[in-house]
Amino acid sequence: MALFRKLFYRKPPDGLLEICDRVFVFDCCFSTDSWEEENYKVYMAGVVNQLQEHFPEASSLVFNFREVGTRSVMADVLSEHGLTIMDYPRHYEGCSLLPVEVMHHFLRSSESWLSLGPNNLLLMHCESGAWPVLAFMLAALLIYRKQYSGESKTLDMIYKQAPRELLRLFSPLNPIPSQLRYLQYVSRRNLVSEWPPLDRALTMDCVILRFIPDVSGQGGFRPMFRIYGQDPFFVDDKKPKLLYTTPKKGKHLRVYKQAECELVKIDINCHVQGDIVIECLSLNDDMEREVMMFRVVFNTAFIRSNILMLNRDEVDTLWHIKEFPKGFRVELLFSDMDAASSVDLMNFSSLEEKDGLPIEVFSKVHEFFNQVDWVDQTDATRNMFQQLAIANAVQEGLDGNSSPRLQGLSPKSIHDIMKHAAIENSAKFKLSSMSEVETIDTPEKPPTDSVKKFIAEDVHSVLQINNQEQNASEDATKLLHQESPSLKLVHHSATVKPLVDDSKSPENAEENFPKSPSAHDGKAISFSPPTPSPPHPVRPQLAQAGAPPPPPPLPAAASKPSEQLQHSVVQATEPLSQGNSWMSLAGSTFQTVPNEKNLITLPPTPPLASTSHASPEPSSKTTNSLLLSPQASPATPTNPSKTVSVDFFGAATSPHLGASDNVASNLGQPARSPPPISNSDKKPALPRPPPPPPPPPMQHSTVTKVPPPPPPAPPAPPTPIVHTSSPPPPPPPPPPPAPPTPQSNGISAMKSSPPAPPAPPRLPTHSASPPPPTAPPPPPLGQTRAPSAPPPPPPKLGTKLSPSGPNVPPTPALPTGPLSSGKGRMLRVNLKNSPAKKLKPYHWLKLTRAVNGSLWAETQMSSEASKAPDIDMTELESLFSASAPEQAGKSRLDSSRGPKPEKVQLIEHRRAYNCEIMLSKVKVPLQDLTNSVLNLEESALDADQVENLIKFCPTREEMELLKGYTGDKDKLGKCELFFLEMMKVPRVETKLRVFSFKMQFTSQISELRNSLGVVNSAAEQVKNSEKFKRIMQTILSLGNALNQGTARGAAVGFKLDSLPKLSETRARNNRMTLMHYLCKILAEKIPEVLDFTKELSSLEPATKIQLKFLAEEMQAINKGLEKVVQELSLSENDGPISHNFNKILKEFLHYAEAEVRSLASLYSGVGRNVDGLILYFGEDPAKCPFEQVVSTLLNFVRLFNRAHEENGKQLEAEAKKNAAEKEKPKTGGLDTEIKKPLNEEVKEEKTKTSGLGKEMSDRLKERTAP
């Protein structure tokens, strides 16, 4: 079919460029030259005449994009030739795109016209400055007809047809991000039952900017927002209006610094519906000059979860702007209009001395805390004025955003008005007048029957101009000019609504077109108002940012020189009838085959020998895959759609050929290509000592007859080299002839060594005696030679192996025969049992010299050698062999015959090895694995396994390599088979990511909801705690008592940073702090507030949460949901393989959207409560983050509890002390009473004792007297 089209392809006439089948663009649209009116008429007439000669049976329909209200010279020329013209606006509120309803009208009109007959042609034309809109609409048409896929690729392909600077000349801002957003609306139309969907009326709550840019050059900016769109309160009026602008009065405009705030939240509270344009500008210090920061265009019908998150690549910015940081992000938070709530504002009256203690309570506080500085050395009066200014700014924000027409209306009455207006709008399904369509008579040539039918049908859906609404719009415009003199806006009353109904089949398309009345013969249909709208200059920020457009190619009237700068907008209205049925040509096969000169064929694969000298270390597995690739990878044909683009547009770039790149990349790896086995390549890889005698011819013939190596089998274990060494002083004895068996093994190993380099080959036995080595490891294989004696004939075979010697990794040689006196004498080996296979190594630390007097020096003596027992090698082999004996014998047999292929490895060895490890952990058959992915079965796999599968998805190069393999698939490795199985699933990596998102969605939603609930609960608890409020009021009274008579006194509030200073301010005796005194006063006066911490239970868990991480989680969920929507749209075209996948994913999407919408509402509400909490303490939400607030409050709670406990302990200690002091007087009186009788008794005893002594002395005297 492609060859047939190529043979019968007809070059389009001069002056036209063919975009796709039967769709042409005038080449004057790609030029910036100015045309004289007469020259332009001659040029256009010549193009039309050539077109009619080229396609004599064809009927043409022209779509023209121009400035509304201006004269079109092209319409005058084309109408003379009987061509039908349909005019569309050139922009929407200065943006290079059109509303969704106008897009739908254009797409259905184009599709219906092309489906009416094979001879119908579609011509596209744009006047000066409208090229960006024309390119956008052409890309939408190609995606709508499913001729191209991929929004970015299609749009870029269209823009390449014109010089690149043309887009920047006509658009000072880069419109591509918003255009791609609207193209996604078109490509994903199959996800909704009705397209375009009904408009949603939403309330834009706020705009959050993260990582703010530096626009002013001083580390910050002063943002200002303007919002344009349809007013949802006036459903019948679809003209775009200025819905919101940031007031320039008061404190609404403030400067945000990057060093002060990472996040900026600006409350909007604006009702929006339909196509919305949001402009963010930065106002200079003079409050006059505006600089455009970015612009966002979207439709509210496609806001699925009431939140729109955009990064710096998804907003329209000035060309080459560099002020935006990498992490810049815009978050637009919405809510349903009936569920919108305002931001909780701070009420400064709550900080008055109402419920707190009066100031008289602290009359004695001066004697404790006089001359103590516990407040920052700043002006307290200035702080108070800043707090009052914040309150005024908040109040003015509410007053500035209120609409005058809504004053006095309750929310319920507003909702009833909107509901009633929506019912009336749905009933008004017909336009009021058909006489206001701008037409141009062409009496020369009547149109064809198909044109008459198309005109008669399309008249019901063209742009209508309602003259009765013009006065009302002019009054509204004057009112807007009076409100904001700096804004110069023009609101046109032009409206449009598509005519098409998708309910009827293409077969009835011809019957559904009614006969055209003769009054419409030769008339052109215009989508612009008959009277030009009043001109207005370009917005100042756009005029300054971009270069002025060049003179238009079409001449304009001399009396209206400024009409070229008008930005008029045409908006859609309701259709006239629903009885129309136009064909849908989705999946059309109209394609054109490129010429032979544009076809790119794959070059022939170069011979393998051309890369054989690149590296001395080959890889047999990779060599095998390369040997198979010339036969298994033929030239891959180019994609028809890609070659069409080359032929149609003459682009200098060629289609990408994955197969060619793959072959080139493989052949460009010299380390993976072994040298071919030929006479010319038999050179030694390293220089050698004196060469041996020339080898016999038998060896030469043996080597040259080796065929190209197939995939290798396990190589045979090498025969250890036997060294019969002697001490260095005596000369070496003559070498004996080598045994015949090792010789034959050496020959066989030499034959098999080139194709099997991974293992060392078997070498012949050397009987030469080298001197003692000076290094621990022995020389590498292939380089083992006797330097002190010429090599005997058997080593000639061994030296012949030197060309492949470097390819063999160096391994230590194991001795196998009886050794003479010297090193290693303790090892006595029976020569009959010399090992025939490799043994397991003993990893010891080898000594190279025996120190005199050591064990090993004594071992070198002959008398000690007999003490070591003989080693039975048979038993040693049976116990410590590296492989089974039968396997070793089989390996020797296989090596003598040549390696046999076992597994073909096409994927890089390390990646294949890691992939097999991953598959061993999955433990699911490959067939069941793909079925689990397509059926989204969470029972078969867990989240970690799915993440591992994503890491090992085949790349494009690996897919091309596997597609080119034509051998036996049973010989492929496990990794290759896994890749082949995964390749059966279209876009397997995207499906796995969607699967992973689905598996983790419930847990992510639950965790984020819990975290948001903790933050919300903490904010509510702090604001609603009456006990905490009375404590804060008491602190205010305490501070005013301390600062009475100073500049810090008479405060109405204090900042949160003042709370920690309660513990830092100490009394004169240093035994008490202000926090202790506060607890003491509260315990004495209002003890019921001391347990306020029980009301703040969520405060501590809230300190462990950062709002930044919550925002990132919310963005990840939204991005994942977007990927689900995108994959669901693409998988609709996969066929039966994705049928069950689509069904399950649609159910999940319906559930996930409801969950995300609910979560977004909670996210928005938490943001409002957080701001309300910060404002509750008189702080600025832009400078005082939530984390700082809760951490300060938690610290205050802990210090308060500690001080209260210390006060309790102090009171207990004082009570014990007082009790002890009271017990002291009683104890002293008891002691005196006890001591008094004791003294009397002592005296009596003394008296008695003295009396007895006197009596005894008298008796003695009497006896002794003579």
Swiss-Prot record:
Which positions are catalytic residues? C126
Looking at the record, the residues that make up the FH2 domain are: 829-1226
Q: Which InterPro entries match?
A: C2_domain_sf, FH2_Formin, FH2_Formin_sf, Formin_homology_domain, Prot-tyrosine_phosphatase-like, Tensin_C2-dom
| Phosphatase tensin-type domain: residues covered | 9-193
Task: State where composition is biased (Polar residues).
Answer: 617-644
Positions of the UniProt region annotated as Disordered: 497-568, 597-825, 881-902, 1210-1266
> What is the name of this protein?
Formin-like protein 13
The organism encoding this protein is Arabidopsis thaliana
The encoding gene: FH13
